[in-house]
């Protein structure tokens, strides 16, 4: 098993993979879109690695910027019906904190990404809520109502969910929905 890989980004392949050169060996690693967007040719990166061996015996390496992303992936794939592709689609759009917050607050709209359907969302919420609460990750849900209302407001203004969530993450905790929307709009106008 590979725990981490540290090396130089040799090439960005497709929309979700890089070739990471470590000691003269190039590893093809799939990354969440949020992580991949920060990778450029020549960058030195350290990734936490999950290895998946498919039914056909072909191995796939999944890379994460931190342990939180890796642990979130591990939690998601334990849910019946969630495979690596589905979990990566979720992590392409949401940070682990946003995933945990959506689970605890039962925010179905936040989890409806990458073709994830209502039945699977229900299963994710029902199977992971006790686990998320057990690890006290529900501290991320403190601002969920404000965030959910702010996302809805930004969506109604024509922004995409990914952009809205990214802007709200950058502005951090706000006192009110209005304040969150105002700050997010300033962030989006940059």
Swiss-Prot record:
Supply the domain comment: Has three domains with a flexible linker between the domains II and III and assumes an 'L' shape. Domain III is highly mobile and contacts RuvB.
Mind listing the UniProt keywords for this protein, alphabetically?
Answer: Cytoplasm, DNA damage, DNA recombination, DNA repair, DNA-binding
Q: Where is this region: Domain I?
A: 1-65
InterPro entries in the record: DNA_helicase_Holl-junc_RuvA_I, NA-bd_OB-fold, RuvA, RuvA_2-like, RuvA_C, RuvA_C_sf
Q: What does this protein do?
A: The RuvA-RuvB-RuvC complex processes Holliday junction (HJ) DNA during genetic recombination and DNA repair, while the RuvA-RuvB complex plays an important role in the rescue of blocked DNA replication forks via replication fork reversal (RFR). RuvA specifically binds to HJ cruciform DNA, conferring on it an open structure. The RuvB hexamer acts as an ATP-dependent pump, pulling dsDNA into and through the RuvAB complex. HJ branch migration allows RuvC to scan DNA until it finds its consensus sequence, where it cleaves and resolves the cruciform DNA.
Q: Specify the domain of life of the species encoding this protein.
A: Bacteria
Subunit structure, interactors included: Homotetramer. Forms an RuvA(8)-RuvB(12)-Holliday junction (HJ) complex. HJ DNA is sandwiched between 2 RuvA tetramers; dsDNA enters through RuvA and exits via RuvB. An RuvB hexamer assembles on each DNA strand where it exits the tetramer. Each RuvB hexamer is contacted by two RuvA subunits (via domain III) on 2 adjacent RuvB subunits; this complex drives branch migration. In the full resolvosome a probable DNA-RuvA(4)-RuvB(12)-RuvC(2) complex forms which resolves the HJ.
Q: What is this protein called?
A: Holliday junction branch migration complex subunit RuvA
Name a single GO biological process.
DNA recombination
Single GO MF descriptor: four-way junction DNA binding
Q: Where is this region: Domain II?
A: 66-137
Q: Where is this region: Domain III?
A: 142-190
Q: What are the subcellular locations of this protein?
A: Cytoplasm
Where do the segments described as Flexible linker lie? Answer: 137-141
Family named by the database record: Belongs to the RuvA family.
Q: What Gene Ontology cellular-component terms does the record carry? A: cytoplasm; Holliday junction helicase complex; Holliday junction resolvase complex
| Pfam families in UniProt | HHH_5, RuvA_C, RuvA_N
Which segments does the entry list as coiled coil? none
């Amino acid at each position: 098993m590979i725990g981490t890989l540290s090396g130089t980004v040799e090439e960005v392949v497709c929309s979700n993979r890089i070739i990471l050169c470590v000691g003269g060996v190039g590893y093809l690693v799939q990354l969440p879109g949020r992580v991949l967007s920060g990778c450029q040719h020549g960058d030195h990166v350290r990734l936490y690695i999950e290895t998946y061996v498919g039914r056909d015996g072909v191995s796939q390496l999944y890379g994460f910027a931190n342990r939180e992303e890796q642990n979130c992936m591990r939690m998601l794939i334990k849910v019946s019906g969630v495979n690596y592709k589905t979990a990566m689609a979720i992590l392409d759009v949401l940070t682990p904190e946003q995933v945990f917050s959506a689970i605890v607050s039962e925010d179905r709209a936040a989890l409806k990404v990458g073709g994830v359907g209502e039945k699977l969302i229900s299963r994710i919420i029902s199977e992971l809520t006790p686990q998320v609460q057990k690890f006290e990750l529900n501290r991320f849900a403190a601002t969920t109502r404000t965030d959910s209302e702010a996302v809805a407001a930004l969506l109604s203004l024509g922004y995409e969910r990914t952009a809205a969530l990214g802007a709200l993450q950058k502005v951090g905790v706000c006192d009110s929905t209005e304040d969150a929307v105002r700050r997010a709009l300033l962030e989006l106008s940059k």
